[in-house]
């Protein structure tokens, strides 16, 4: 699907998002204070989140699984780069074969080795000597790192390939968002369709949690968008972010949304302040657009990797 939506957020929009995350956390906290532990919705969801259908461990040793997963992530990173570049340029993902974007010469196999080829070629094309975009090794390294961390976190379970696929979708969406402030509908609309059966059958989540997460995630961001537009007369964020939160809500459930939103808001605000200090602009800083998709993706990955531990710590903190 080629149709796209803007994915930008302003400083005022970031503040609104952080306030919304704080309110969501307050609501969860109040629920714990009013209910016995055995009746808490978080306590019930905690058990469901850990129900994974595992592959027999004898088939794959952990000490081999993590390096293999990291290598797989590096290889997938090359494909993610193709998706990002060709989406932005409007080319087909399948044809033509991999080539230099400057001289259009087809790349040989030794020029396609993740990260290593970039280092051996010293960051430039072997024929025309034009620079290779730094995005290529960074995306490959990021993909390898996230794949290795997922393998370490989940091991050889059904959760690993599920989260690997969706992490790859988030990497591609973030790369596109950083380049042109757009989140593709193929990911933001196709993702929820895939996330529903994945969450229910592979991750052991109740279908009510998956649907409720999507409704709360997308609905909350849509409400912020509409209220901000009504009060300020401008868009505080792009509609692509609303659709991305729909996907993340389905995949992570309603209890993952406060952490995702908080991490995204705080990290985006920190990036905004850093950019404001390093790159002075003539336009008002509060109107400076920031691609929000990468920060939502970061929040989702933090939840996937350590959300249960953070949730357990938060429960102990608020219940004494």
Label the predicted regions.
Residues 1-19:
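Extreme N-terminal basic, low-complexity initiation segments
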Residues 6-10, 22-28, 36-41, 47:
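Short terminal hydrophobic/aromatic SLiMs and anchors at protein ends
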Residues 48-62, 316-320:
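Short, strongly hydrophobic alpha-helical membrane anchors
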Residues 69, 159-273, 312-320:
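Functional transmembrane core segments of multi-pass inner-membrane proteins
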Residues 80, 84, 146, 150, ...:
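Alpha-helical membrane-inserting segments
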Residues 83-135:
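Membrane-proximal soluble regions of multi-pass membrane proteins
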Residues 239-240, 280-299:
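Interfacial loop-to-transmembrane junctions
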